[in-house]
Amino acid sequence: MPKLGEKDFNCEKELTLSIIGGKWKMLALWHLGKEGTKRFGELKNLMPGITQRMLVNQLRELEDHLIVHREVYPVVPPKVEYSLTEQGRTLMPILDAMYEWGKTYVATNLQNHDEEEQNGN
């Protein structure tokens, strides 16, 4: 059984989802993976609805798990950039597969479900 810190997991899939799961982490990973290094404000603008505090927390957790790298530059005003680590980049094929699965699911299931509701079924 895998363990992360003090937490035990039933399997590696559960551990993976605990690291990248949540409303905002995958979106942040997606932008960093597809668009490259971003400053905090750029990431926040790409994620409408996220609060500054939530983005800070999500990025810190990803940094703690060595998925995201945070680079602080000694300039005024402060400049901080975020990028994927090598370990973080290994998640991109998984995120790509999840994206494709979601597109297919929406196209086949949700569209059919909406049509059935319109037809009274």
Predicted regions and their residues:
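Long, low-complexity, charged/polar intrinsically disordered regions in eukaryotic proteins
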Residues: 1-4
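N-terminal helix-turn-helix DNA-binding core of bacterial DNA-binding proteins
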Residues: 7-54, 81
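Amphipathic alpha-helical dimerization/coiled-coil segments
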Residues: 31, 89-121
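Residues within the DNA-recognition helix of helix-turn-helix
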Residues: 58
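DNA major-groove recognition helices of helix-turn-helix
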Residues: 62
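Glycine-centered, phosphate/nucleic-acid-interacting loop/turn motifs that mediate DNA/RNA or nucleotide
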Residues: 66
